Amino acid sequence: MSVLRWIVPALLCLALVACGPPKKSVFPPTVTVQQLTVLPGGQWQLTVRIQNNSYSSMDFSVLEGSMQVAELMPIRLHASFTRDIPAFAGDVIQLDVLPTAAMTQTLQAVAAKGSRGSLAYRIGGSARAQPEQEDTPRDFDFSGRDWLSPVPGMPGTFR
């Protein structure tokens, strides 16, 4: 009988613990340049895609990083914004950056090749986000490499 006095309360406690909400896994986002547009003043407008790879929505607020084009000196990326991105979904932000003269020349050389041209880039940094089940935001590191190519019929646009 004394064993039952221990087993019943222990089973009730375990049942209550099991009733809590399941913890959703959180993973770093993927950040890529979806489009680069050369503006009339020589600035570049980047359309940056943030892909939430987590099982819960995340509130993104800051992007800090750098972008390196064709092994040239990297340029700083910084943006403050508000985006609530659902689980396994993505959204875009716009960033205006001022490229170096060498970056501009490299991009012009790629544009001159037309659809045969492509430009390697590397992006890295951190994105600040608050996962759905957490009380405070935290920084998630990201890094990636990809290529940009001229878009036929859209001068000054690369994807």
PLM feature spans:
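Bacterial signal peptide processing site
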Residues: 20-23
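Beta-strand secondary-structure signal
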Residues: 30, 45-49, 64-66, 82, ...
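Terminal connector regions
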Residues: 101-157
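Post-signal-peptide N-terminal segment of Sec-exported extracytoplasmic proteins
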Residues: 26, 35-77, 129-140
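Short structured motifs
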Residues: 30-34, 46, 77-81, 106-111
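Intrinsically disordered, low-complexity Pro/Gly/Ser/Thr-rich segments with frequent PxxP/GP/PP motifs
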Residues: 70-106
